[in-house]
From Swiss-Prot:
The active site is at C254 (glycyl thioester intermediate), C445 (cysteine persulfide intermediate). This is Adenylyltransferase and sulfurtransferase uba4. Pathway: tRNA modification; 5-methoxycarbonylmethyl-2-thiouridine-tRNA biosynthesis; Cofactor biosynthesis; molybdopterin biosynthesis. Plays a central role in 2-thiolation of mcm(5)S(2)U at tRNA wobble positions of cytosolic tRNA(Lys), tRNA(Glu) and tRNA(Gln). Also essential during biosynthesis of the molybdenum cofactor. Acts by mediating the C-terminal thiocarboxylation of sulfur carriers urm1 and mocs2a. Its N-terminus first activates urm1 and mocs2a as acyl-adenylates (-COAMP), then the persulfide sulfur on the catalytic cysteine is transferred to urm1 and mocs2a to form thiocarboxylation (-COSH) of their C-terminus. The keyword Protease does not apply. Residues 378-490 form the Rhodanese domain. Keywords: ATP-binding, Cytoplasm, Metal-binding, Molybdenum cofactor biosynthesis, Multifunctional enzyme, Nucleotide-binding, Nucleotidyltransferase, Transferase, tRNA processing, Ubl conjugation pathway, Zinc. The gene is uba4. Binds 1 zinc ion per subunit.
Length: 492
């Protein structure tokens, strides 16, 4: 019976997803038909057609409306009419319709690229809106590519917009990339970055890659000029610059590390600029191009920009060298495993079940403030240690909790040989380290990972007094607290 219910639920979910996709396609068709009608009407007006049989060919390469729309950039010497014509015939693929992809798509659509493809399987969330400038509040829950294209069509109906409502996979990447001239990597995870770079090299596509976190960003143009595999004169790929991926546990997302909107917006706009430069360049520009470099942006530094030269193609690169082991075939067959290559951090499970407690269990065990009578009766009052960084603790915190950031805890020296108050770190409050105190300690963080690390560290320091004192983490962190205890708890 349970299996049948799961099957029914799965089928309902598939039907709902299919209906949503169909509705999205219908909207795309309606907007496309409207845009086509507007362009046709403009074309009729600009060519002076009065009636059937009296057609007059437009003597100019652009429509009258296009001269007005793009005139301010066409009078720039680096672009000109020929540059605009190159833009109009260009096919640009943007992977990721988030903080980087939105401003990049916005300016490329505004510049008049001919075809703009958007790849993203995510839907719009409220937490996206402060930085992902193509999405609006009314589109929360909608596929990001649909939300973005809706905005872009209002900005400029001339380009052809192609949505890909799924995350990029190795099997599908070559088939998608082959239809485009240049690719923009606007994603935020290493596995996808390597996949995008590998596919771009194998299919001969220049790649503009960027990243942003907190107040900093990076930008690099890869595989430019795009030369065949084994040709040392080609631009380096992502593997040439970063042969080994960072440890999975060291990768910090915007959700964990934070991001200032204009920082990621700056990087996305820079991606659009680099894409326009590549599209409008000439063969002579390729021969005289500057060595590849990594542009680093730091919003709170002076000066905010600096550039680092990077090496050319590596002689032993797994993708672009003569010794390449990654091919289109290995992508399509799945034998190139990007998740295995980059590793997966996943949720931490460092503690035994008896060292963890759910928010609901904690609430049942400690329903409220311990009264004076209870204290006299020998009941132990819990100590809650919040190991989030102070900037997060200041946003919201549990009543009577103590803030000791995980960074402070991890900076402690090796475990002491004794657990006397004098041997314990100074960051621990005196009443906690007192040898007479056996009050239980509950450790909480945002998601339930750092709290486990902190519990293990505290026990290594001897704070549990050889097992006499109960120390555990609140499983799932403050996100679980919101789900189980307080639905009004701020979610950030």
């Amino acid at each position: 019976m349970e299996n049948l219910e799961q099957t029914c639920a799965s089928l309902r979910a598939q039907i709902a997803a299919t209906e949503a996709q169909l509705a999205g396609l219908k909207r795309d068709l309606e907007v496309a038909e409207q845009a086509a009608a507007e362009i046709k009407a403009q074309d009729v007006k600009s060519t002076g057609i009065r009636e059937e049989g009296s057609e007059k060919k437009n003597p100019w390469p652009l429509l009258s409306e296009e001269y007005k729309r793009y005139g301010r950039q066409m009078i720039v010497p680096q672009l000109g009419l020929q540059g605009q014509l190159k833009l109009r015939s260009a096919r640009v693929l943007i992977v990721g319709a988030g903080g980087l992809g939105c401003p990049a798509a916005l300016y490329l659509a505004g510049a008049g690229v001919g075809t703009l493809g958007l790849v993203d399987g995510d839907t719009v969330e409220h937490s996206n809106l402060h930085r992902q400038v193509l999405h609006r509040s009314k589109n929360v829950g909608k596929f990001k590519v649909d939300s973005a294209i809706e905005y872009l069509r209002e900005l400029n109906p001339h380009p052809t917009y192609v949505p890909y409502r799924a995350h990029l996979t190795p099997q599908e990447a070559p088939e998608i990339f082959k239809d485009y001239d240049i690719v923009l990597d606007c994603t935020d995870n290493p596995a996808t970055r390597y996949l995008i770079s590998d596919t771009a090299v194998l299919l001969g596509k220049p790649l503009v890659s960027a990243s942003a976190l907190r107040t900093e960003g990076q930008l690099i143009v890869l595989n430019n000029p795009p030369r065949p595999v084994g040709d040392k004169s080609g631009g380096p790929c992502y593997r040439c610059v970063f042969p080994k991926p960072p440890p999975a546990t060291s990768v910090v997302s915007c959700a964990d590390g934070g991001i200032i909107g204009p920082v990621v917006g700056t990087m996305g706009v820079l991606q659009a600029i680099e894409a326009i430069k590549v599209i409008t360049s000439s063969p002579a520009d390729e021969t005289s191009a500057s060595p590849p470099s990594l542009l680093i942006f730091s919003a709170y530094s002076t000066p905010p920009f600096r550039s680092i030269k990077i090496r050319s193609r590596r002689a032993n690169c797994a993708v672009c060298s003569a010794e390449a082991s990654v091919t289109v075939e290995t992508l399509k067959t799945g034998s190139t495993d990007y998740v295995f290559f980059c590793g997966v951090a996943g949720p931490e499970t460092l503690l035994r079940p008896e060292e963890r407690i759910t928010p609901l269990e904690f609430k049942k065990k400690h329903p409220g403030q311990v009264s004076h009578e209870q204290e006299l009766g020998g009941s132990k009052e819990p100590t809650i240690i919040d190991v989030r960084e102070q900037v997060q603790f200041d946003i919201c915190s549990l009543d009577n909790s103590i803030n000791i950031p995980i960074s402070t805890i991890l900076s402690s020296a090796a475990s002491p040989t004794t657990s006397t108050p004098e041997s314990l770190p100074s960051w621990l409050p005196h009443d906690i380290v007192s040898s007479s105190s056996t009050d239980p300690i509950y450790v909480v963080c945002r998601l339930g990972n750092d709290s486990q690390i902190a519990v293990r560290k505290m026990k290594e320091l001897g704070l549990d007094q050889g097992g006499k004192r109960f120390i555990c983490d609140i499983q799932g962190g403050l996100r679980a607290w919101r789900e189980q205890i307080d639905p009004d708890w701020p979610e950030y």
